[in-house]
Amino acid sequence: MDYIIEVLPFMLDGFRTTLWVFAITAIFSIPLGIIVCLMRLSKIRIINFLTQVYILIMRGTPLLLQITFIFFGLPIVGIVLNRELATAVAFILNYAAYFAEIFRGGINSIDKGQFEAAKVLKLSKSTTYFGIILPQVFKTVFPSLGNELITLVKDT
């Protein structure tokens, strides 16, 4: 019992850190994932290509390697981040790539008639995506987002 009382403050501190990293990552990576998704769906080839490369790198390399690169690699080029910020940036960039692919799958699952109807009504692309498409996408991708958020808790 004495041992439990002795280590409890350290466990609570670790729990606080886990919650902080989870909250910061969820708050920033989901909107960034939507932006990256829309860039991935762009008709501008260079934006589409660069976004594909970003997603490929982020999803294809281990998260620990990305954290190490951001914490130890960026100071080589003069960008120094403290360990909490480096961890948060790595998590945000990593999970934004995963969320982007989830949202892209959700957008691709929407019937093309929705896009055509918005075009006939002469709605702008931003109104089409943010007013018509994304609300439907959230309903579709909600289970996948939940799974990814559970993975985020485990990763932190």
Regions found by a protein language model. Name each.
Residues 1-156:
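Transmembrane alpha-helices and adjacent helix-loop boundaries
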